[in-house]
A protein has these predicted regions:
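Active-site-proximal beta-strand/loop segments in catalytic clefts of secreted hydrolases
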Residues: 49-53, 121-122, 142, 201-205, ...
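Sec-exported extracytoplasmic/periplasmic mature domains
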Residues: 101-105, 132-135, 249-253, 289-296, ...
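Short, solvent-exposed loop/turn and secondary-structure capping segments
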Residues: 60-62, 141, 149-154, 209-216, ...
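Autoinhibitory propeptides
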Residues: 94-179, 185-189
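Bacterial Sec-dependent N-terminal signal peptides
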Residues: 1-20
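Catalytic-core segments of hydrolase enzymes
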Residues: 296-346
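Subtilisin-like serine protease catalytic core
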Residues: 42, 175, 185-225, 230-280, ...
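Primarily auto-inhibitory N-terminal propeptides
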Residues: 15-102, 106, 124-150
């Protein structure tokens, strides 16, 4: 499920009849939905493979050489907090990856923290190709493609909305009440505007971030799409990530200024809004590991999962203990790596 953490902002702005809703204020167009189309890539399934170990006797990686798989920024963050690089930081064993690929199975994702692989097949019988690979301890179906999905098309930014300017008093424009509620004005007055920090934003897309004037000055550290890795543009789908990002990164004086306009931002798509499946937890785990390797200080995630399109995948109550679901374990591990993970609960 995709939850917004914007309720505070929305309620603070609701009293102002000049801004009928947050979408209008940020000049965001509605997404155009067209006819149903076949699921991209055709009918397929994805399975999560659990691996027994990191093959420490043969792996080329070592915790003594973290610079081979972590950025200097990530290593420094650990050192600053007295946190060691451990075996969970080591990449998935290359020999295991090769064996799965050589068996004719397509690998679409991997998690070093959880020591798992995400693979895609088109027929159940293809799993037989993995028989005899003793390093695979368990398999779990995490996705089955629906017959069709709604096609979503990027809308253009409406010029009329971009011409909108705030008559709210002061530098912060329509964000004034939001900043005041968070004591942001005092922080900004003391030069705490996010400079030196890197923040990763996890969402389902960032439509038109590249076109909205208030976001033109964003300090963009990187972009990654774990749902459609070959995608050329995460700015073409889903406006929710744009809204979340704007509350932090927008910087257009007298119109809207976010709480941390001087921070660097890593934009990551790990939510597939077309479907709900356990595979999205694998995407999230990959996103967290990518953010860690880039050296982020904070992860802002607007994602959480409980019920799925296939009810057999739904999490039971006893699984909701913070230790069972793959995404929960991954979120907890962020703290082990020195990252503050903030997730919505809307």
């Amino acid at each position: 499920m995709l939850y917004a953490f914007l309720m505070t902002t929305l309620s603070l702005l609701a009293h102002d009849d000049r801004v009928t809703n947050f979408e209008q204020m940020m000049r965001l167009p509605r997404i155009t939905e067209t006819d149903m189309v076949s699921f991209p890539g055709g009918k397929c399934m994805m399975y999560r493979l659990y691996l027994k170990d990191k093959d420490l006797m043969n792996t080329p990686y070592s915790v003594e050489r973290p610079e081979e798989f972590l950025s200097s920024r990530s290593i420094e963050r650990r050192k600053r907090q007295g946190l060691p690089v451990d075996v969970t930081d080591l990449p998935v064993a290359p020999a295991y990856l090769k064996a799965v690929s050589d068996a004719g199975i397509e690998i679409v994702g991997k998690s070093k923290w959880n020591n798992t692989l995400l693979v895609r097949i088109h027929k159940e019988k293809e799993l037989r190709k993995l028989e005899g690979l003793d390093f695979i301890t368990q398999t779990r179906k995490v996705f089955e493609a629906p017959d069709s999905v709604t096609q979503r098309v990027r809308s253009s930014v409406r010029k009329g909305n971009n011409d909108w300017t705030s008559d709210a008093s002061g530098e912060y424009g329509a964000a004034k009440d939001q900043l005041k509620a968070l004591n942001g004005e005092k922080l900004h007055a003391n030069a705490y505007r996010g400079k030196g920090l890197m923040i990763a934003v996890f969402d389902g897309g960032f439509m038109n971030v590249d076109k909205i004037p208030a976001l033109h000055g964003i300090h963009l550290a990187g972009i990654r799409d774990f749902v459609v890795p070959e995608s050329k543009n995460v700015f073409a789908e889903m406006e929710h990530g744009t809204m979340v990002l704007s509350t932090m990164a927008a910087n257009l004086p007298e119109v809207y200024i976010g709480v941390a306009p001087d921070a660097q931002y890593l934009l990551v798509r790990c939510e597939d809004e077309r479907t709900e499946s356990l595979a999205e937890e694998d995407y999230w785990a990959e996103a967290a590991e990518y953010a860690d390797s880039c050296g982020v200080d904070i992860i802002n995630s607007s994602l959480g999962y409980h019920g799925f399109d296939d009810a057999k995948m739904n999490h039971h109550y006893y699984e909701q203990d913070g230790n069972t679901a793959l995404i929960s374990r991954s979120a907890s591990m962020c703290a082990d790596k020195g990252i503050v993970c903030v997730n919505s609960a809307g």
